[in-house]
Amino acid sequence: MKKILLLFIQLLSILSVDAQLKKMPAYPLITHDPYFSIWTVNDKLNERSTSHWTGAEQSLIGLIKVDNITYRFLGDIQNPTETIVPFGEGNPTDCLYTETDPGADWMINSFNDKSWQTGKMPFGKGWGNDAATPWKSKSIWVRRNFNLTDLDIEKLILQLRHDDDVEVYINSKLAYSCKDCSVGSIKEYAINDSIKKTLKKENNILAIHCINPRGYAWVDAGLGKQKKPKALTKAEQLSVNVTATQTTYTFKCGGVGLTVNFLSPLIASDLDLLSRPISYIDFNVESKDGKPHQTEITFAVSGDIAKNERKQLVKITNGQQEGVKYLKSGVEGQKILGKSGDDVRIDWGYAWLASANPQNILSVSSTKKMIAASEGRILNETGSEENQQQFMTSSIKLNIAKNKKSSSTVMLGYDDLYSIQYFEKNLEPWWKKLHGSMENLLNQASKDYPQILTKCNEFDKQLFDDAVKAGGNEYAELCVAAYRQSLAAHKLVRGENDEVLFPQKENFSNGSIWTVDVTYPSAPLSLVYNPVLLKGMVEPIIQYSESGKWTKPFPSHDLGTYPLANGQTYPEDMPVEEAGNMILLTAAICKADKNIAFAKKHWETLSRWVEFLVKDGLDPANQLCTDDFAGHLARNANLSMKAIAGIGAYAQMAAEMGDKQKAGNYYSIAKQYASKWINMADEGDHFALTFDKKGTWSQKYNLVWDKLLGLNLFPQSVYDKEVAYYITKQNEFGLPLDSRKTYTKSDWVMWTATLANNQKDFQTLIHPIYKYLTQTTSRVPLSDWHETTNGKQVGMQARSVVGGYFIKMLEYKWLTK
């Protein structure tokens, strides 16, 4: 009987581990920080090149030769692009332009453009002010006449950089367009053959319309051509499975089964492990047909992961320390911390490919050599490899007997040398003091791999099981999808006094560092797994005020533009938003710590902020809140609710410090404000968006802290009324943010759902978000801002705010478990 029971328990354990996530908009492969973050946006691993979260290509390639037949299981390989119509960056190009609407036929070849101005691409403002021609209006139309010496073009490539929305025509035909989009560097897009056929030797027209509704502006374009590679044999992908720390694929390669596992060991409770910028890629081969096989696995990493722009040159060197061989790749002529901004990638420090297996051969390859290898041949030609990608390559032969297995593991890491600048001082990553050098870290990481794999397997199972208990299977899968993405939008840095600093980058929503209203939605993940990380997000903002560098009576919005944290760079404040956020986050830290010390340390600053909330929080003036994409809003009921909860949280902390008089005073104010709020916002069967606009509604996600902190400011009837109303307002892919638009923020939906007092209503509210996760056609790292009618991304992606999905787990931990 005991044996049967033990077998049953083991079976349940296996089922639990396997019951993870099979479908995502994009799949995390290598995820550590905002600069070291590689994804695939296809369900099949070998359908497309891998990319950085920004969409810039950062190619990983995997090939397996089985008995002299080569299969590609990872990434894609394209021939180098040869420029045929140069873009303007670095060599401005002549064209015609107008900033006045030219009418409907402006893109037609025969259009009369004689009244247009002469200028040079690129056009723009901002972005370092290095545009050839300034562009400051809302729209620009550009026409460029070009000739071609050769029409032998196998594959036509559009080379384009735009900020923001753009439409591009070639010889009167639409070649490319996108809305609510921008890119910060030249990117390449394959153009279909029907447009290629319109090309002629003389008088072709490239016509572009770009709009600039906000912020910086840029447009630059050219054309290139590629030779089409030979049709390659692809491994047959059988499955993909995502857990909190791992993404695993299985393939059929003739008579051999191949399993590839990407492990980024982001264990939030283990600062040493969390800070290590090293992922493990494990290859396991197994005979599936009862026969012995000779196999050879090649894994290649493009030098692009160490540069921001294609034109930058990288240098690859090799070495060995103890039993670990390595290659490292970095840009020549580096400037450490030399770039800041949103759509940018790192171009300082070094990418490392390493192996402790003596049979593993590490070498440097070019694009042409990789294509030759994928075709099962050796490249004999010599000559210039200029403009080709350079690859760090690992190859190993694994011979397997019939019905047997064999495996090999490589490590891919990144040493950024210095991670951020913190008030003019360059700071190293957390791991540097512990391990000294990347060589030392790689050796330690190699030795630790068996224990790390076990630890990650156990953590993945525990996270999933806890999430199922908190909110059900769909909720658990949402948490799995959010975990790595949220943590990898941060960087764990050591302060000058050994303090933990955990800044995040505001990915594709401004590029700011230490944004308070990004920390606020991200916080639940850290509160569940390691509140020390939340302190590393919150305390620098407090210290900015305490230093005297920030003198306003409310907190700053941010500390700069990633990775430079030298003071706020966002052009507008969010007074009530950030004051409420900081007080609520401090109270949450104290609850998680079961200790009031953190608040006590900064009590004077918190007291100044709560006075601001008392004065300005009940009925907020016209101002931005965290949902700044929706614009300024006065008399915002949800923002008022945040202020009221913040005042109540301050009272709670005062009580824990033994100051009964202050606690009573502020709790009384919060209760009075809550009562007034109910009267001002009441719309009968729900509460309004603003106090002065009838017939409106909004998600009151800020109410969740009244529940989680046990403030008891609002009666249960407020929760019940709002939740019941929300259920009537849902669309196919979620509950809209409010009555103004049909888009939503999925992190806020998760908070709103947690207001429900039963699992049925909670799951009813999150199910459309699960549907969005698994059915959206927007193939990018999970966007938290999407359209509820069609499930498409509106903007923003790969942000840390999906850590807010863990709010239900936080409720389970604090109020249920």
Question: Model-predicted segments: where are they?
Answer:
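Acidic/polar, glycine-enriched structural segments that form the non-catalytic walls/loops
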Residues: 20-28, 37-38, 78-108, 206, ...
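Extended ligand-binding clefts on enzyme/binding-domain cores
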Residues: 323-377, 506-518, 524-531, 550, ...
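Carboxylate/His-rich catalytic cores and anion/metal-binding grooves
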Residues: 55-81, 101-102, 165, 227-235, ...
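Well-ordered alpha-helical scaffold segments within catalytic/enzyme domains
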Residues: 38-42, 62-66, 251, 282-288, ...
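Beta-strand-rich ligand-recognition modules
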Residues: 161, 167-224
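Aromatic-rich carbohydrate-recognition surfaces in CAZymes
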Residues: 437-452, 511-620, 636-654
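Long, well-ordered core segments of solenoidal/helical folds
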Residues: 305-306, 486-494, 531-552, 591, ...
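Aromatic-lined ligand-binding clefts that engage carbohydrates, nucleic acids, or primary amines
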Residues: 116, 138, 146-172, 206-208
